């Protein structure tokens, strides 16, 4: 089974971008262009447009903060040790433990009595508990990230 079956591309982009941001001094800003440039050192086909969409979703979910203006960019919405992979998954994937595996929802004739649904729900709960135990700080700690040349470390005026 491929790793990609458990994690969406959107989740992968977010994890990489957040780990990069966590390696910078707290309150430092990162632009989408900077994040995309670094991500292209990890995989050449990283899309800046797709990354921008992911970062905007993270901003709407409070994981990152948007800073407008000429010297704007994004910063982490809270300290990296306070952002779990579960937080990221919930913002990006809309995690729901009530989903029927056949997408029947409330119309399922076996609602509450389906062995498959109970088993899958149990697996999903365990998966989410595991994600909750891993912070962005832990993820970043195991990474060596070189900030691309020409990128300055800008601090948010709000911090």
Q: What are the roles of these predicted feature ranges?
A:
Residues 84, 102-159:
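C-terminal regulatory/oligomerization modules of transcriptional regulators
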Residues 62-77:
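Beta-hairpin "wing" of winged helix-turn-helix
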Residues 1-6:
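Short, Lys/Arg-enriched N-terminal segment that forms or immediately precedes the first helix
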Residues 51-61:
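Basic amphipathic alpha-helical segments that dock to polyanions
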Residues 73-93, 97, 104:
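Charged, amphipathic alpha-helical coiled-coil/dimerization segments
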Residues 39, 92-93, 131:
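Hydrophobic aliphatic residues
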Residues 8-9, 13-46:
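N-terminal helix-turn-helix DNA-binding core of bacterial DNA-binding proteins
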């Amino acid at each position: 089974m491929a790793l990609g079956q458990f994690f969406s591309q959107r989740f992968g982009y977010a994890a990489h971008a957040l780990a990069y941001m966590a390696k910078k001094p707290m309150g430092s800003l990162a632009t989408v262009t900077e994040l995309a440039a670094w991500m292209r050192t990890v995989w050449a086909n990283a899309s800046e447009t797709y990354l921008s969409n992911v970062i905007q979703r993270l901003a709407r979910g409070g994981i990152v903060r948007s800073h407008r203006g000429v010297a704007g960019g994004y910063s982490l919405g809270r300290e990296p040790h306070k952002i779990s992979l579960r937080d990221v998954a919930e913002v990006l994937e809309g995690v729901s433990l009530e989903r029927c595996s056949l997408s029947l929802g409330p119309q399922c004739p076996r609602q509450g009595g389906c062995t498959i649904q109970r088993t899958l729900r149990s697996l999903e709960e365990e998966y989410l508990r595991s994600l909750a135990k891993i912070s962005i700080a832990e993820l970043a700690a195991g990474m060596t990230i070189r900030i691309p040349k020409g990128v300055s470390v800008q601090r948010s005026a709000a911090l």
